[in-house]
A protein has these predicted regions:
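Residue-level detector of family-conserved "landmark" positions at structurally sensitive sites
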Residues: 39, 72, 177, 198-199
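GST-like fold's C-terminal all-alpha helical module
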Residues: 106-197
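Conserved residues at the C-terminal ends of beta-strands
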Residues: 65, 161, 200
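GST-like domain detector, emphasizing the conserved glutathione-binding G-site
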Residues: 1-135, 139, 146
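Short, flexible loop/turn segments with low-complexity composition
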Residues: 91-93, 196-204
Length: 207
């Protein structure tokens, strides 16, 4: 969607203070080293201009001059193409398709559980157990490479690392046999790019 009445010279990101989906976009921006204006959105009282930009009034919303994007995957892939270095997706079609599928699996299998846990209620405990059990079951995938299924950081990491960062805050305690998940997290968390992706609120989610 393009808005001709708006003209911007830098990227503007509308993002919540603590949102796993917004964090994905901030992590991609940090990995690219791209400067941007960050508008922190109170989801209970969003700014009026957000509704003018995005008919769903949702975050994350990215504005690049006259272009407005408001789907997390669309935003992340746009950033990777708009700022090609360092790449966050493989070059060849087969590997790109596999990475996209990994992102879809993380979203559908795990991030939906994060949303359920954060929503609270009776479903939260079941979602917490499902997330814990599924991470344990897939722990070996976290040590197959330095990053998730890749020797280099990718959009899969931008999707997964914000989840791993939140595990303690979500009340998801992993057993020793899933140490590969937390080892993966520590490798990511030590990077300057990850530190730059955090809001002040998100920095408090881990001791």
């Amino acid at each position: 969607m393009a808005l001709n009445q708006r003209s911007r010279t830098v990227l503007t990101l509308y993002s919540a203070r603590d949102c796993v989906h917004c964090h994905r976009v901030r992590m991609a921006l940090a990995a690219k080293g791209v400067a941007y204006d960050h508008v922190v959105v109170d989801l209970d009282n969003p700014p009026e201009d957000l509704l003018d930009l995005n008919p769903y009034n949702s975050v994350p919303t990215l504005v690049d001059r006259d272009l407005v994007l408001y789907d997390t995957n669309v935003i992340c892939e746009y950033l990777d193409e708009r700022y090609p270095h360092p790449p966050l997706m493989p070059v060849d079609p087969l590997s790109r398709a596999r990475l996209r599928l990994a992102v879809v699996r993380i979203e559908n299998d795990w991030l939906t559980l994060v949303d359920q846990i954060e929503a609270g209620g009776k479903a939260a405990d079941a979602a917490r157990k499902s997330l814990r059990d599924d991470l344990v079951k897939n722990a070996l995938a976290f040590k197959a490479s330095k990053f998730f299924l890749s020797p280099e950081i990718s959009l899969a990491d931008c999707t997964l690392a914000p989840l791993v960062w939140r595990l303690d805050a979500l009340g998801v305690q992993l057993p020793r046999e899933a140490h590969a998940v937390m080892d993966y997290g520590e490798r990511i968390f030590r990077s300057q790019g990850f530190a730059r992706s955090l809001t002040a609120d998100e920095k408090t989610l881990r001791p």
